[in-house]
């Protein structure tokens, strides 16, 4: 079986070039194979030497992401609570503004007909 790098050599050198090509890509030649069939050395699995460190860093990142998502949910809940409080305070302010308006516009004219407490007490 040919490796992909040697496939082009089989077609061009088949029967003409009996030995392995002078290249550093092929380390050995198996003579029991047909002429022109060369084996490439097995490619090693490339794993970085600091893989455990990277794995631990990824786990730390996942933990950090989880913690940040929890904080985000808490912040969103706090924001919803603050919006509810804001709405209730706006309703209270509107009700008090309406009460003051009613007191000044409707009741004040009626109160001016009667003497004040100070006038009744004789201080004015």
Curated annotation (Swiss-Prot):
Q: In which tissues is it expressed?
A: Strongly expressed in brain, kidney and ovary. Moderately expressed in liver, spleen, thymus, prostate, testis, small intestine and colon. Weakly expressed in heart, placenta, lung and leukocytes.
Q: Where found, per UniProt?
A: Cytoplasm; Nucleus, Nucleolus
Give a yes or no for keyword Metal-binding in this entry. Answer: no
GO cellular component terms?
Answer: cilium; cytoplasm; nucleolus
Q: Which keywords fit this entry according to its UniProt record?
A: Coiled coil, Cytoplasm, Nucleus, Transcription, Transcription regulation
Record-linked Pfam families: Tektin (PF03148)
Coiled-coil segments on the chain, per record = 54-96
Per the record, the domain of life is Eukaryota
Q: InterPro entries, per this entry?
A: Tektin-like, Tektins
Q: Which GO terms describe its biological process?
A: cilium movement involved in cell motility
* Family from the record: Belongs to the tektin family.
Q: What does this protein do?
A: Acts as a coactivator of MAFF transcriptional activity. Inhibits cell growth and colony-forming efficiency.
Quaternary state and partners of this protein? Interacts with MIS18A. Interacts (via its coiled-coil region) with MAFF.
Task: Tell me the protein's name.
Answer: MaFF-interacting protein
> What is the species listed in this Swiss-Prot or TrEMBL entry?
Homo sapiens (Human)
Q: What is the lineage of its organism?
A: Eukaryota, Metazoa, Chordata, Craniata, Vertebrata
Gene for this chain: MAFIP
């Amino acid at each position: 079986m040919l490796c992909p790098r040697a496939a082009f050599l089989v077609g061009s050198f088949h029967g003409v070039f009996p030995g392995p090509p002078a290249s550093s890509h092929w380390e050995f030649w198996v003579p029991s194979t047909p002429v022109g069939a060369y084996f490439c050395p097995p490619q090693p699995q490339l794993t970085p030497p600091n893989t455990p460190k990277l794995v631990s860093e990824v786990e730390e990142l996942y933990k950090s992401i989880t913690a940040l998502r929890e904080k985000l949910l808490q912040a969103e809940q706090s924001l919803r609570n603050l919006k509810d409080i804001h709405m209730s305070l706006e309703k209270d302010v509107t009700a008090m503004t309406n009460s003051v308006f009613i007191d000044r516009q409707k009741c004040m004219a009626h109160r001016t007909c009667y003497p004040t407490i100070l006038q009744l007490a004789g201080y004015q």
